[in-house]
């Protein structure tokens, strides 16, 4: 059970690090994937499963990093237009469509299939879900705190207005 408490401490520390803005450091997902790879490879001990897992994880990590870097650098933009199927057509409505970037993370999971997900991949996804859940809880707590402050502020404002009105009428 000593390993469980260290894992809990690591998760708490990682959550605290996620809430603090960082600059140009490797993403938490990359660190978690590397950590899980080291732990999983020691427990699995099979080179074939290691190669298969390395390729899957590097593909998914590269896809996530590509999508994240693209959205950070370029911001929201419309995708490029498709070329018309009939180049000789003039003045008419040309069949225009948009190429949408597919959700690469979902595609990787769909390609792998749920049957092929081993314990290591499930552990990686579980940890990512825990990080996301922790962020959500922190945001919910922050929202509750702001609602409490707003209620207190408006209560004080109304009280001061009533006291001011009472003093004005008394004069």
Swiss-Prot record:
- So which domain of life are we looking at? Eukaryota
Q: Listed GO cellular component terms?
A: endoplasmic reticulum; endoplasmic reticulum membrane; mitochondria-associated endoplasmic reticulum membrane contact site; mitochondrial outer membrane
Task: Give the location in the cell.
Answer: Mitochondrion; Mitochondrion outer membrane; Endoplasmic reticulum membrane
Keyword Metal-binding attached: no
Q: Work out whether the entry's keyword set contains Endoplasmic reticulum.
A: yes
InterPro entries in the record: FATE1, Mff-like_dom
Q: How does it sit in the membrane?
A: Single-pass membrane protein
Chain segments annotated as transmembrane: 151-169
Leader sequence residues: none
Q: What UniProt keywords are attached to this protein's entry? A: Apoptosis, Endoplasmic reticulum, Membrane, Mitochondrion, Mitochondrion outer membrane, Transmembrane, Transmembrane helix
Assembly mode: Interacts with BIK and RNF183. Interacts with IMMT/MIC60and EMD.
Report the function annotation for this chain: Involved in the regulation of endoplasmic reticulum (ER)-mitochondria coupling. Negatively regulates the ER-mitochondria distance and Ca(2+) transfer from ER to mitochondria possibly implicating it in the regulation of apoptosis. May collaborate with RNF183 to restrain BIK protein levels thus regulating apoptotic signaling.
Identification of the protein by name? Fetal and adult testis-expressed transcript protein homolog
State the species of origin: Sus scrofa (Pig)
